């Protein structure tokens, strides 16, 4: 009985969230502190099964000062897609190898943002999915997520 009640609550929450997101053209999430932030979005919120999903992760500098992000490898970002139960169904970096070199990205007044994109083309079953975009900086890791609907 508890499992059924919990399942009903999850469905209601995801349905309400989906209805709220439908009012907006695409799915967007933004997280920030006083100096910098992250914006995660998709090209739209509702997809047909098999339709490509375009994901965009933006890192923004809200100041006129340089902000430096340091990395342990050549990887700068990642995208993860999870189903309604929280199971990871896709990770952008899954089958990739990154050079083991230290690196940095500097956001300043001349270049206050950097954008990373990825496209997912395989098929999922219809339902709600959470997409998380991650900046993998060792000193300032950040993430943002959005919910999409596959019909």
Question: What are these language model-derived features?
Answer:
Residues 25-40, 45-118, 128, 132-137:
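Contiguous segments within soluble domain cores/interaction surfaces
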Residues 9-11, 56, 120, 134, ...:
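Generic detector of bulky aromatic hydrophobic side chains
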Residues 1-28:
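Secretory targeting signatures
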Residues 122-151:
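Terminal connector regions
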Residues 4-5, 17-19, 38, 133, ...:
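Intrinsic-disorder/low-complexity peptide segments enriched for small residues
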């Amino acid at each position: 009985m508890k499992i059924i009640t919990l399942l009903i609550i999850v469905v209601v929450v995801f349905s309400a969230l989906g209805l709220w997101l439908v009012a907006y053209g695409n799915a967007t999430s933004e997280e920030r502190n006083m100096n910098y932030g992250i914006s995660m979005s998709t090209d739209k919120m509702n997809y047909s099964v098999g339709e490509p999903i375009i994901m965009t992760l933006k890192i923004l500098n809200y100041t006129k000062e340089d902000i430096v992000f340091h990395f342990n490898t050549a990887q700068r970002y990642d995208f993860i897609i999870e189903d309604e139960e929280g199971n990871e169904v896709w990770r952008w970096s899954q089958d990739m190898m990154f050079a083991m070199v230290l690196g940095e990205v500097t956001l300043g007044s001349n270049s206050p943002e950097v954008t990373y994109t990825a496209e997912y083309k395989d098929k999922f079953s219809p339902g709600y999915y959470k997409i998380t975009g991650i900046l993998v900086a060792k000193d300032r890791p950040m993430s943002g997520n959005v919910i999409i609907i596959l019909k």
